[in-house]
Structure formats: C-alpha cells, structure tokens
Amino acid sequence: MADNSTILEKLDGLVARFEEISTLITDPAVIADQKRYVKLTKEYKDLDDLMKARKEYIQLLGNIEEAKNILSNESDADMREMAKEEMDNSQERLPALEEEIKLMLVPADPQDSKNAILEIRGGAGGDEAAIFAGDLFRMYAKFCETKGWKMEVSNANEGTAGGYKEIVCSVTGDNVYGILKYESGVHRVQRVPATETQGRVHTSAASVAVLPEAEEFDVVINEGEIKWDTFRSGGAGGQNVNKVESGVRLRYIWKNPNTGVAEEILIECTETRDQPKNKERALARLRTFIYDKEHQKYIDDIASKRKTMVSTGDRSAKIRTYNYPQGRITDHRINYTIYNLAAFMDGDIQDCIDHLIVAENAERLKESEL
C-alpha cells in the first residue's frame, strides 16, 4: 500500500488549480478564446475526477481512524462489530482506490479524447489481402456500433475480388482515439482463401493506421495555397457514378517543421454526393495528416522511454494474427491469445483492448515512479 500522506499531498496540491479553473471556465473572455476554453474544460474534467477520488480517499482514512478508536475504547459488542465491519470494508477499498488515483495522477496521452481517422490497407497477399481488409473494416464498424460511435467512410478503393485495397473512415464519439489507437499496426491472417482450389492455408496481411483527428486550431494551414480539383464519383465505395463532379481532390505543399523538408500532400474525398461536404472532410483529413506528422517527434520521445511498446511506435510492426483454421486470435504485443475468432471478427474486441490498456498503464506507472 502506498504512503497515505504522499498521495494526499499530491491531491492537496491540485485543489488550488481546480478552484482556479472552476472560475476561469465561467469567464466570458476565456469562453471567447475557443482553443483555451477547450483545453481548460478538459483539464477541469480530469481534476474533477481527482477531487472526487480525493474526497472518497479522505473519507476512507477517516472511517478507518474512527473504527480503530471505537475498537480501542468501546465495550458494546454491537458497536464493536459495526466498527470492525466498517474498518474491513474501508481497508479493502483503499488499495484499489490508491491504484486508481495513481493512474489519474500520471499524465495521460493528450490525444486520447480526440476523434480518429481510421485507415485500412490491404498488404501482401493480393486479392485475399483486400478481402481481409474488408473483414477488418466490418469488424471495426461493428465495434463502433457497440460503442455508440459514428463511423463515416471518407474514401474507398475496392478490391477486384471484394474487400478494399484501401478504405479511410472518420470515427467520432467519446474517447475514440484513446481506445482505437491500440489497433495501429500490421494485422496478419492465416486461412484458406475463397479463391484457393487446393485447400491450402495462405498468409496475408492488412495494415491499420489510427490517427488522432486534428481540430481546426491544432494546426495552421494556409487555405489559399490549397489546389482543388473536382471529379465525378459515387458514394462511399465508388458505386453509382454521379453525373455531377462531387468528388474532390486537394494538393497542398507542406514543410515538416521537424525535418525542414517540403512535401506535397494529396487527399481525395468521395464520401458524399455533396461537394461542399466532401471539401470539408478532405480539409479535416489534411489537418489530421499534418497534425500526425508534426506530433511524430512527441510519439517517438514516448517510445524511446518505454521498453515495451503497446500503442505507439512503429506502425509497420506486426501486432496481431488471425488464424482461421484454429479459430485463434493472438496479439503479439502482450502474448494475448483467445479462441473466439468468429465473435472477434464480429466486433467483440474490447477484451483485447482492455488487456492492452492494462499493459500500457503498467508502463506509465513505471515511468512516473509514483
């Protein structure tokens, strides 16, 4: 069990900041500054959770002290029994609450609360890889549905035998990036393809990238320097070709502040039959792309401090294998293996993500030395 006074000192040190923010977020001048207001309301929510935990922690310590006092001085059997029960309950809850508080005190990934851009691409394996990319898309669509998140396809390039060579989606909801970020990496599938006549098991792969969606004030873009083109397209997936040019393509020259190198960014959006909406979504993807690149140094810095990488680092790393003949899923980052592949592919992936979160939290606690 942690030293009670150390945890209380840390919590007490945050009371003044919580009171300061409580006042600031009602200030009209702060509310008018959208960037500052959003940042402060996020900090307020985090500190509010800590203040509630602090209140419970002080209550538990008080309960234990009062119960000890009764047991030392009270002769009435009923009073002593009630005091012992109160002390046992409080002592049982205290270590769990301490762990919760420690995790709350460790700085969280500032991106976790953001929405996300989900990119799935068929890799090695030709048609079968594209089909598997389609299976992963369906898996994530089902998962998003269970979470109450909204998923919208921005762009899709269908495979010749089904599935997708590439599909890009935006996902909006509560703490989307903080949960989906664990899916970034290479997903490998072992199964007999529908096109296989000899019944042989093939290995194919698809890559998944999950990027925190940037807000307008996260990056600076000179919209006057964007070159726009329009073209005819269908809805998501490219079917039903329009007679109007609703698809949009943007080109933007961006200089990487970390390297000083200029590069051209090309983004297409065919999500809707409404050109202004497609422009808006293409801009959102441009902001996210630049934000992701500019924050790569931040991600690399975190990666260099950790011995085991769970949610950040190399997106080309093989993270999970889907073995159909055995009905097995193996996540290689934490040696997690289960044999419910059908349910997993139907969107039941939360348990795996929970195990990854536990592993990452353990790393965060080691870093903080709390």
Swiss-Prot record:
The keyword DNA-binding does not apply. It comes from the Bacteria. The keyword Cell membrane does not apply. It holds the Pfam family RF-1. Methylated by PrmC. Methylation increases the termination efficiency of RF1. The modification N5-methylglutamine is found at Q239. This is Peptide chain release factor 1. The gene is prfA.
